[in-house]
């Protein structure tokens, strides 16, 4: 690839968030083929070769060798005398390939190509991020506090993606400073002005449920089920559990030896008072237990 600094280093594509290499190569080829169509009215007789490992890109034009004076389309045909001046072994009817340098496109076309490539990469990153976190809705994620505002906290995940924890989704006793590690559940993913907005929550009942799944193997394995959660975030919560194995005490398993399992959950929720009770389908009995 010539020194137009169109793509300074293909290795940088490996650092692009949320985009796999094969997708990136497809976008690159598509952008360059679009430029070829504008420049030559077709890209059918061109080969675009992208090698991200070596960090280069080549464009080759394939033309048919024809008799002198028989060239009707200089983009798809080349006179035999012209090609023999380069390589005497070529004959009429052969296919001749010559490399196309980006400089031949012209400065304006190269600038347009740069802009198109940057726009496509940005759109691809946004779409990939939206899809990635849409699949994570209901899951716990961990990130680092980057900025604390009055109405929300800006969090960065391990890839530098921006996540939002609104004030309304924070536990009343939550207090954060830049650099703090934060754990929350992905509540929803929105698309505002073509920009993904990933909303987290620490007040959702599902956050408490996922914390129990992390701390109690029997819940994670499906031996114990959380049937219902009633919660005032940061103050208290009632968690009704049921065991599918008569040998397992669901309440005891959730609390752990001397409260070892539930302690980390209480700590994560700013000392929220959590009561774990046995579930029953009898409403009046359930009220008594609660």
What do these predicted regions represent?
Residues 1-290:
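RNA-contacting regions in translation and RNA-metabolism proteins
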